[in-house]
């Protein structure tokens, strides 16, 4: 058994920020888990919307990378990583593309709200490094993700989803399929 030594690099890093980073890591991993569930739902033979599956798998990987980036920050700042149980997705059956996109939009808004609270904490604790880190790597990306998902929800509704299965098929093929090509 090794004894943990106090950090030699910790400077201007409040314990509340350290704890909040650990909570954010958990939330990012939860988001990754939800997107992974969505991806493999759309990959099922009775759903067969391969571009929805690819889209959500990409989102899952992105959320995991966000968690890893926060873990790296925690180590760089002299904090300690304390992983917690990852909450399972609220559902296993995502019903249709519109419902999944609506759930994803809600999820991203929750992640964004948590990041904004973390930024406020960093500001209150006079931690410009953490503020800059969040602004550089997370906040703008969240706004873009929320806008993209909002657009997807709008377009699916405009096309007649979920009542029209053809709408989902065309959205999968043309909208999400185009994302894959670029």
Curated annotation (Swiss-Prot):
Under InterPro entries, the record lists:
Ferritin (IPR001519), Ferritin-like (IPR012347), Ferritin-like_diiron (IPR009040), Ferritin-like_SF (IPR009078), Ferritin_CS (IPR014034), Ferritin_DPS_dom (IPR008331)
Q: Cellular component terms, GO, for this chain's entry?
A: autophagosome; cytoplasm; cytoplasmic vesicle; lysosome
Q: Locate the N-acetylmethionine modifications and list their residues.
A: 1
N-acetylthreonine-modified residues are 2
**Pfam families named among the record's database cross-references:** Ferritin
- Gene Ontology BP term (one): iron ion transport
Q: Which residues bind Fe cation 1?
A: 28, 63, 66
Reply yes or no: does the keyword Oxidoreductase apply: yes
Domain Ferritin-like diiron intervals = 11-160
Enzyme Commission (EC) number: 1.16.3.1
Give the residues the record marks as binding Fe cation 2.
Answer: 63, 108, 142
Listed SUPFAM superfamilies: Ferritin-like (SSF47240)
Protein family (similarity comment): Belongs to the ferritin family.
**What is the protein named?**
Ferritin heavy chain
The gene it comes from is FTH1
